[in-house]
Amino acid sequence: MKKFCQKLVGNKELIKINYYIAPLNKKTHPEQYLEQQKFFNELKKIKKFNIILGRLEKRKRDGEIYYVEKASDVDLALDLALDAQKEIYDEAYLISNYGDFSGATNAVKDFKKEIIYVAIGNRKVVSHYLKNVASRTFYITKNFISDCKLKT
């Protein structure tokens, strides 16, 4: 993950990496929960890496139970804007295709900071909202990913 982020920023200083996610439910998904915790433990070993936890809320529709991730998007948007206000960074890299981050992206630009939208996936899933408001867009390619893989 750090190699991916460092390749993304190039020769610029990497201030911090924030990863926003909701932990899985230990009772309903015990095996996946353990795997996720192992993954988190590996990520915690990376210098400057922060895991910001949201939550999963249980929902039911037509007799089917499903979970919705909550708070991660709000936490990310707040951190983008508040860190820009606090002069913590000059450039932020937003790795998400969630168009609702366009408001936070505009807020960052109001503080005279650059925000780079990092688009992953094919052009059909790219957020045109983010693309239109970001300072610039960087497309992740297969070659970029291949260069970041660990060499064994």
Give the positions of each predicted feature.
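Nuclease catalytic cores that cleave nucleic-acid phosphodiester bonds
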Residues: 44-152
